[in-house]
Amino acid sequence: MIKITLKDGKVLEVEKGLTVSEIAARISTSLRKKALGAKINGEKAELMDVINEDSTLEILTFEDQEGKDTLRHTASHILAQAVKRLYPEVKLAIGPSIENGFYYDFDAEFSFTPEILEKIEKEMNKIVKENLQLKKFTKSREDAINFMKERNEDYKVELIEDLPEESIISFYEQGDFVDLCAGPHVPSTKEVKAIKLLSVAGAYWRGNENNKMLQRIYGTAFTKKAELEEYLHMLEEAKKRDHRKLGKELGLFDLKEEGPGFPFFYPKGMILRNTLENYWREMHEKAGYGEIRTPIILNEKLWHQSGHWDHYKENMYFTKIDGEDYAIKPMNCPGSILVYKSDLHSYRELPIRLGELGLVHRHEYSGALHGLMRVRNFTQDDAHIFMTKEQITSEILGVIKMIDNFYSLFGFEYFVELSTRPEDSMGSDEDWEAATNGLIKALNEAGLEYKINEGDGAFYGPKIDFHLRDCLGRTWQCGTIQLDFQMPERFDLSYVGADGEKHRPVMAHRVIFGSIERFIGILTEHYAGAFPTWLAPVQVKIMNITDNQVEYCKEIQKVLNENGIRVELDLRNEKIGYKIREAQLQKIPYMLVLGDKEMNEKTIAVRARKQGDLGAMNLTDFVAMVKKEIEEKTNCL
């Protein structure tokens, strides 16, 4: 007998040689039916894997992200098999699972039209019904290369040739189809009960613009048709909320071919942006942060010293000034470090909190650009805290509380991930362990549940990531807290301790917006452009019924302006119904309709974006109501 320790700590004694699937059945029949994969001793595994020794075991279902990934990875193989059945001459590239779905890249001499996608999807459903078993086998590197050459799969050959000579190469077979793959997969194609192809896009082979442009087919898969229908409904709603579409329609922002990845903000968009930035400043001033501004372009030597040159060079832009090499900053931290280092500091001054709304530039491939969500220049709301080791927990707790208050204001729920040391990192094991333990302690004291994201930390330290969940259930990674023992060492930072000696401070990097541009994109979709009154670029629209009320409209506008309310006049010679519809399309919180009756009685007729007609109101009462909404930052979701 062997001992199997489950995720909840329970221990099962079972016979040696059982499969994961058989052990799942011992736990419960319902779990076996829902199981899609597993983790054995923390490593990804499949349901048909055999366990012969004491092990830890986690059964994965569709409720787990790894379970979703396993199912959708198999769906990508089903897609590739369907394409090869219908179009044998097409060459295969890669096909991973991704967030909310999967894709496969193909080299085809024809375009995948909507009609062809429909044909492929029918073939995929046929493959699902065939209940094909997925079987893993391995070959030596040399045999694997020859195997793929015989199949004319040039892209697979290239991938294998890049691996070390001693590599053992794994493949998966399902019926008449074989693909190069490390796995894991579900046992059979029948597990993929609901599948849908979504779109086609261009993608350079291996993400390199110098390589051939392939065709990438995107799809998604679920274990239940009802879940697929719900997801497709969400996608339709997301299209209506697309920030790129709303940004143009509402006159907020745009992206142009003259500056790919470099956003243009229009006057209304700048009002929204400035309102957010001013709130950020207000919040940070209350929390004891000093705001700084550091240069966009800094000498290349600084980036060698910081480590960015070795770990981040491919994402940076460079220029020459007076014959010397300079870099356009991709991050704000070295500048903040120079500000700290410009003076001597005593332990009595710590913690020192410095915040910056800093413009950074990072190179992204053109194919990766997406509205405000993925750009090449953006404003990052960085703050850096310089502190003693004893202050770590209290400072990180303070940041967590600030982030929680900030996201709650906008109606966001969130979940937390702790990302640990990546392969490409700098610093000692001891420093990484101390930094990671410091973050864990703060998370535990804050009472936050979190997931470990192995190997996804920054190159200089572990981090806590905050993932927002919007009103459609989509998640967005925004806030980050990173603990850093490396930068203070590299820049020889110090403070004078109570003993009169120099000591090394600990540094924390943190952002809340992440990128202001991206956060605005997320907010635009979250609210579908109908921003709460305090954020709305235009808070009140005043419209007349006839020319008789023009002067009265201007009087009302003056009073609102004097009370700090953002207002627009619509005095066009149009029907009032048309004006109201247009204001509704512009998603303006309040509309004031002024006719002879309102003018004579010195009242206003109020329409609210959400509640509709509110009837006649006294102007003083209306001003008080709107100002209260603005001051309290009422969320209108």
Swiss-Prot record:
Record field: catalytic activity: tRNA(Thr) + L-threonine + ATP = L-threonyl-tRNA(Thr) + AMP + diphosphate + H(+)
EC number from the UniProt entry: 6.1.1.3
Keywords: Aminoacyl-tRNA synthetase, ATP-binding, Cytoplasm, Ligase, Metal-binding, Nucleotide-binding, Protein biosynthesis, RNA-binding, tRNA-binding, Zinc
Cofactors that this protein relies on: Zn(2+)
Domain of life, source organism: Bacteria
One GO CC term on file: cytoplasm
Organism of provenance: Clostridium novyi (strain NT)
High-level lineage: Bacteria, Bacillati, Bacillota, Clostridia, Eubacteriales
Protein name: Threonine--tRNA ligase
